[in-house]
Amino acid sequence: MSAPAFKLRPYAPADEDAAIELWRRTWQLAYPRIDFSTRVDWWRQRWREELVPVATIMVAEADDMVVGFVTVDPTSFDLDQIVVAPEVQGKGVASALIAEAKRISPRGLDLHVNTDNERAIRFYEKEGFVISGGALNWRSGAPVHKMSWRPPAS
């Protein structure tokens, strides 16, 4: 069976419900002991107040469904969220979203990833990111790595 075809496009307000549900679903799979259904209202508020106003958001779409998205603030280099549906993970969607993030913010990208998320860390390293610091997530208190990508010097 071939990988589903997908396309990248700019976020539209009509994508909000699908993006937030995808965000919830992927985090629920990553952290099954936490009930993320109780956080949907908080995610929606954060989406509307913190991400949409400042970030460039690109959506991956397959069969008219949102299967991924990335949020990038090109003024601060911040890649806040990259979310990919489990059914298309490993099919190039995340790499395409990272490539798009690099296009949006060509001077560099920074992100934070939980230190126990080894799969994501390996993926980011494969995409050219390096661990550039560490901290505690100010919301959850979990330890995080700061990972950074900068373009090669010309």
Outline where the language-model segments fall.
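Conserved GNAT acetyl-CoA-binding A-motif
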Residues: 104-116
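Conserved N-terminal entry element of GNAT/NAT acetyltransferase domains
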Residues: 1-14, 149, 153-154
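Acetyl-CoA-dependent GNAT
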Residues: 10-87, 98-100, 104, 137
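Conserved active-site alpha-helix within GNAT-family acetyltransferase domains
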Residues: 95-96, 116-133, 139-142
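Short hydrophobic/aromatic beta-strand or adjacent loop that forms the aromatic wall/cage
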Residues: 55, 142-147
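Active-site acidic-Proline motif in GNAT/NAT acetyltransferases
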Residues: 85-91, 115-116
